[in-house]
Amino acid sequence: MEISSHQSHLLQQLNEQRRQDVFCDCSILVEGKVFKAHRNVLFASSGYFKMLLSQNSKETSQPTTATFQAFSPDTFTVILDFVYSGKLSLTGQNVIEVMSAASFLQMTDVISVCKTFIKSSLDISEKEKDRYFSLSDKDANSNGVERSSFYSGGWQEGSSSPRSHLSPEQGTGIISGKSWNKYNYHPASQKNTQQPLAKHEPRKESIKKTKHLRLSQPSEVTHYKSSKREVRTSDSSSHVSQSEEQAQIDAEMDSTPVGYQYGQGSDVTSKSFPDDLPRMRFKCPYCTHVVKRKADLKRHLRCHTGERPYPCQACGKRFSRLDHLSSHFRTIHQACKLICRKCKRHVTDLTGQVVQEGTRRYRLCNECLAEFGIDSLPIDLEAEQHLMSPSDGDKDSRWHLSEDENRSYVEIVEDGSADLVIQQVDDSEEEEEKEIKPNIR
């Protein structure tokens, strides 16, 4: 038969012994403050103490002292009280420190409780936020006239009381009525003076809507000017003169920060304008490189896959990018600095020949050809003709490519680990226009 109260009674007795320093055989020093405890209790409750006390298990006759600098005494007090009572005193101010100390002491139960506490606190704050906005929406619907007078009360003129009290929804404190005249603000208590001008309410609503739409989008000064012209032309039947209307709109636009827009009632929502910033949408699956265009991602993937789809028609060397091929051709071949591959001496079409060895082609001078033996090396006469200056009929085509070479290089590379299929295509037309493909000479 199990007695459930025995465990709590035993913990209570151990806690009393700790408070009275009875049979305490372990001292914990935390930033100069000493805590007394029992080694058996610490051994059973903390993985760190279990490892620490196991190393000194042979010296049980002497008291053990442990020193910590990773957390504060107040934090360790909360943890030690939990060890002896099973009650964890968490608040919004100490939950992070307690969770950090519990992680250091390898107390998984305390870490789980701290995580649950943080999550529940976030849920409560979200619920309170939703409740606040729902109440503000209801108040805005029930007090629409007062809300409209809060933002557009400057359309009418009238004397205000020397001092007026703000309602709790608008703020607290006492504000002078005349001090708000330059901001076109009239408190809600002046509703009686605004009733004779109720015929301007549709006009004010339209201006508020226009202002909301204009401020909710990233705009410059030109947008504000265009919105002013739209407001002036949209309602020509207004009894307010053009000069008063222009002055009112200017005051409203100038007094409103660009990064904010009005919501219902007195709610103000911050706008960060994320559409103005470039969106990086393509991420490399092999590294952290991020690009804006798919063509740039395909070009970047060649450094991982080792693809070299652009061969040099003069020497057969392959490149991963078209601009690298163009730079190679300009600096090596088009510069007319033909050298022998073996002796590195300058050669011409008369003093050297093009030799093809497998897929590679290079030049050798006549002396080096005589050393190797001209019969033992294959001479590519057709390649030598390609290295000559192109004929007049071929000047329009910058590259002397066959029909098979003119096809776009399309290769499929499959990566089983990432389940990624990469299709390499030609660079965009924009890049092709920028690239200069010189004649082979």
From Swiss-Prot:
Segments for region (Disordered): 143-251
Lineage of source species: Eukaryota, Metazoa, Chordata, Craniata, Vertebrata
Species this chain originates from: Homo sapiens (Human)
Subcellular location: Nucleus
Record field: compositional bias (Low complexity): 234-243
Phosphoserine: residues carrying this PTM: 161, 167
Main location: nucleus
Compositional bias of kind Basic and acidic residues: 198-208
Described purpose of this protein according to its UniProt entry: May be involved in transcriptional regulation.
GO biological process, one term: negative regulation of transcription by RNA polymerase II
Protein name: Zinc finger and BTB domain-containing protein 8A
Biased composition (Polar residues): 143-170, 178-196
Pfam families for the chain: BTB, zf-C2H2
Keyword list, A-Z: DNA-binding, Isopeptide bond, Metal-binding, Nucleus, Phosphoprotein, Repeat, Transcription, Transcription regulation, Ubl conjugation, Zinc, Zinc-finger
Gene Ontology molecular function terms on file: DNA-binding transcription factor activity, RNA polymerase II-specific; DNA-binding transcription repressor activity, RNA polymerase II-specific; RNA polymerase II cis-regulatory region sequence-specific DNA binding; RNA polymerase II-specific DNA-binding transcription factor binding; transcription cis-regulatory region binding; transcription coactivator binding; zinc ion binding
Residue ranges occupied by any BTB domain in the UniProt entry: 24-92
Family annotation (InterPro entries): BTB/POZ_dom, SKP1/BTB/POZ_sf, Znf_C2H2_sf, Znf_C2H2_type, ZnFinger_BTB_dom_contain
Zinc finger residue extent: C2H2-type: 282-304, 310-333
Superkingdom of the organism of origin: Eukaryota
Cross-link Glycyl lysine isopeptide (Lys-Gly) (interchain with G-Cter in SUMO2): where in chain: 178, 182, 191, 199, 437
Cellular component terms (Gene Ontology): nucleus
